[in-house]
Amino acid sequence: MSYAADVLNSAHLELHGGGDAELRRPFDPTAHDLDASFRLTRFADLKGRGCKVPQDVLSKLVSALQQDYSAQDQEPQFLNVAIPRIGIGLDCSVIPLRHGGLCLVQTTDFFYPIVDDPYMMGKIACANVLSDLYAMGVTDCDNMLMLLAVSTKMTEKERDVVIPLIMRGFKDSALEAGTTVTGGQSVVNPWCTIGGVASTICQPNEYIVPDNAVVGDVLVLTKPLGTQVAVNAHQWIDQPERWNRIKLVVSEEDVRKAYHRAMNSMARLNRVAARLMHKYNAHGATDITGFGLLGHAQTLAAHQKKDVSFVIHNLPVIAKMAAVAKACGNMFQLLQGHSAETSGGLLICLPREQAAAYCKDIEKQEGYQAWIIGIVEKGNKTARIIDKPRVIEVPAKD
C-alpha cells in the first residue's frame, strides 16, 4: 500500500472509530515509541497563523473574486426583512438560499502546527475553524469537514501515531461544539497542515451582521493576547541562542505556564461568547487570528455602516509575554497589535451599559475573564491602539 493510501486508511479509521481511547494525557513521544526529540512543530517552516498572506497583499489577490452585488435589483427578503449577502473580507460567507428565509453560513481555515501535542493541535484547529461562525453570532454548526496534509518527512511510525491523535482532537472539539465531522480531504505534502470547513443553515435572526457599531459602544475581548509569543518562547527553551535573548525577563517555569495557558485558550471554543452576543445585544464582532488584534479591528471598523472608529486602550496579555515580546524588539509587535494569534478571542462591539454584565456572565459560565479594552467613537471607520496602552497580565489558570 502506498504512503498516500495509508494516510487515507488512517483517516477513515480515526473518523469512524478504531482509535485509541486513552488520548487525554499530555503528549509524551516516548510513550508512543517515538524519539524523545520528536516535535510536531518541526514539520513546517512557519508556525500556526504565521502562514497568513499579509493583509494588504491578500486584499489585492482576492479582488478578482469580489462580486458587484449592487447590480442586483434588491437583496433577498424574508418576512419583509432584507437578508444581507456577506462575502470576501469578513469572517464568514453568508449566502441567501433559494429556499425562503434561509442562509448558508460557511467558513474554511487551515494552518501549520503551532503546538507539539497532536491531540491538542487537532482541538485547536477545530476551534479555530468554528471561531469564524461564532464571530457572526452563529452558535450551532450543522457540519464540518477536515482538511489535513500529512508531511512527507514523517516516518510511517510517526504518521501512524500522530495523525490519529490530531484527528481525534479535531473530532472531540467538533462534538463539544455539538456538530460532527462527516469527511474532508487528506493529502501528503512537504509541510503538515491542519484545518477544515464549517457550514450551517440558519435564519437571519440566528446571526449578527457585524456592521452596526454606534458611538458610545465599548469593545470587549474574550481571550488574552500573546499565544504566538508563548508558543515561540516555549520552543526557544531548547534553543540556547534564542533563549539567551529572553532569559533575563522570564523563567522556564513562567514560559511553560504561559504555553499551557496559550494552548488551553486556543483550544477553548468561542461558543459561549457567541451565544451571549445575542443576550447582550452585540452590534458586531470578529475573531482575532492571523492579522493580530489591530488588523482584525481595522477590518471590522471598515465594514461599519456608521462613521465610527475603534480606539483600544487595554491589552490583556498572557502573563510575562509582554516582557518577552519587548525583549525581542520588533519581532512580534505584540503591543502594537500586529502579533498573530491562533484561535483567539472575539472582539465584540457592545452597548456600554451591557458590556460589564456580558463580561460577568462569560466568567460565570466558563470561569474565564473577558475584558473591556476600548471604545467606539465618531470617526472614519478606522481602528487604533493608543500610544501607551495598559497591559493587563493574565495569569495561567491552575
UniProtKB/Swiss-Prot annotation:
PANTHER family linked to this entry: INACTIVE SELENIDE, WATER DIKINASE-LIKE PROTEIN-RELATED, SELENIDE, WATER DIKINASE
Keyword NAD belongs to the record: no
GO molecular function: ATP binding; kinase activity
Native source organism of the sequence: Drosophila melanogaster
Gene: Sps1
UniProt note on tissues of expression: Expressed at low levels throughout the embryo. At later developmental stages, expressed in areas of high cell proliferation. From embryo stage 13, expression is high in central nervous system and midgut, especially in the gastric caeca. Expression also seen in larval imaginal disks and brain.
GO cellular component labels: cytoplasm
Swiss-Prot/TrEMBL GO biological process terms: negative regulation of reactive oxygen species metabolic process
InterPro entries according to UniProt: PurM-like_C_dom, PurM-like_C_sf, PurM-like_N, PurM-like_N_sf, SPS/SelD
UniProt family annotation: Belongs to the selenophosphate synthase 1 family. Class II subfamily.
SUPFAM superfamilies: PurM C-terminal domain-like, PurM N-terminal domain-like
Stated role: Plays a role in apoptosis and consequently a role in imaginal disk patterning and growth.
Keyword Transferase set for record: yes
Keywords for the protein's UniProt record, in alphabetical order: ATP-binding, Cell cycle, Developmental protein, Kinase, Nucleotide-binding, Selenium, Transferase
Name of the protein in its database record: Inactive selenide, water dikinase-like protein
